[in-house]
UniProtKB/Swiss-Prot annotation:
Positions of transmembrane segments: none
Listed InterPro entries: A-crystallin/Hsp20_dom (IPR002068), ACD_IbpA/B (IPR037913), HSP20-like_chaperone (IPR008978)
Keywords: Stress response
Gene: ibp
Stated name of the protein: Small heat shock protein ibp
Residue span(s) of domain sHSP: 35-148
Source organism per UniProt: Buchnera aphidicola subsp. Acyrthosiphon pisum (strain APS)
PANTHER family in the cross-refs: PTHR47062, SMALL HEAT SHOCK PROTEIN IBPA
């Protein structure tokens, strides 16, 4: 999830204090109302399949396998998308252009027990399968309680 900082304090570095305020206020409300996205990073789901298997699904319509790079280095998963040709459609004059292919980069810190098993791109969804193998020495262990049979009975007097 990406956050952008928001400040209501005027920037006095401009030549005129109010020179760009109305445009900035308009952009702020467009972002807050959802007219413009806060972030250009792809949306994703993370699902636990069972005790050891997980799946990360990214929504990246329009990207091809050759435009994606997935790597793991020092337990950090990096997924990058770089569009080779962002203007795939020739147009004399755009009346509205809402489909934009921005380059993106997502990073996830992985525990040392988590391994990426495979990645698959189909119908605009990139699915990564993970496996989390916990070594036996790190699994919780049940400790039984022994009660000796020769307990003394307390006599009432």
């Amino acid at each position: 999830m990406s956050y952008r900082s928001l400040s209501f304090i005027p920037n006095f570095n401009d030549h005129n204090v109010f020179s760009n305020r109305f445009n900035q206020i308009d952009k702020m409300f467009s972002t807050l109302t959802g007219e413009k996205p806060i972030s250009d990073t792809p949306t994703y789901n993370l699902c636990q399949i069972n005790e050891i298997e997980y799946q990360l699904t990214l929504s990246i319509p329009g990207y091809q396998e050759k435009e994606l790079d997935i790597s793991v280095h020092n337990n950090q998963l990096s997924i990058q998308g770089k569009k080779e040709n962002s203007d795939t459609q020739e147009c004399n004059k755009w009346l509205h252009k809402g489909i934009v292919f921005n380059n993106f980069s997502l990073n996830f810190n992985l525990d040392h027990k988590i391994k990426v098993k495979k990645a698959e791109l189909s119908l605009g969804l990139l699915k990564l399968d993970f496996e989390c193998n916990i070594p036996e020495e790190e699994k919780p262990k049940k400790i039984s309680i022994n009660v000796p049979n020769d307990t003394k009975k307390i006599d009432k007097k």
